[in-house]
Amino acid sequence: IGAVAILWVLAIGFNPALRISLKSYFKQLNFSIIWEVMGIGIPASVESVLFTSGRLLTQMFVAGMGTSVIAGNFIAFSIAALINLPGSALGSASTIITGRRLGVGQIAQAEIQLRHVFWLSTLGLTAIAWLTAPFAGLMASFYTQDPQVKHVVVILIWLNALFMPIWSASWVLPAGFKGARDARYAMWVSMLSMWGCRVVVGYVLGIMLGWGVVGVWMGMFADWAVRAVLFYWRMVTGRWLWKYPRPEPQKCEKKPVVSE
């Protein structure tokens, strides 16, 4: 039903810029465009699969830590997801903003606006996380009245607030890079950070050293830290714009002055 509704809206064309006639769906395929789409879609899909599988594995670590820890971990993730909603929205916006600016050749504007979105997300999410952390126990009481579960939730929400300043560099920046067709770099970084940090560090701290669910979350924060460093470096150096080279300024030759 949703797909039919979308096709109907596009065919009617409430926005003339988005009007797509039904005849256009039966035209010959343009494989050059398809390859460009696949160049972004395939790395993004691989990144999503790797992230989901790694997150599932870390949840298996928590599954053997008792019902109170499992419940507290689930509730903390739910609260953290609510806190991160503005950042997720800005991440989606960064893809659109950079893609739109680069599509019309405004390379400098794309770079400036991605930085603005990044800092807006960083400051906003940090403020939200730090303001809501003191009320972690109150928010947990909407889910349960078990004191052990609430204790786990409070610890995890405070840890989440402590590491929130690096969240935007981990997730908003790669979303903006995808708007510049720089999806492969995000894929390789995600593979390295997920399996080299979140899974390994989470297992070592949470299982081998006995830190429990805190160790598993520290593995997640190590994943954030690696992603934040690599993606921030990518933004600062401007290498995420490698498919959009800047035009070289033309050198003006000085004409010799002829004296009369």
What would you call each of these model-derived segments?
Residues 1-42, 98-163, 205-260:
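Short alpha-helical transmembrane segments in multi-pass integral membrane proteins
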Residues 1-7, 14, 41, 45-60, ...:
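Hydrophobic alpha-helical transmembrane bundles that constitute the permease/transmembrane domains
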Residues 34-36, 69, 82-86, 92, ...:
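Hydrophobic alpha-helical transmembrane segments of integral membrane proteins
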Residues 49-82, 100, 138-147, 208:
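Helix-terminus/linker motif at the lipid-water interface of multi-pass membrane proteins
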Residues 173-177, 184-196, 203-218:
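C-terminal structured "cap/appendage" subdomains that terminate the fold
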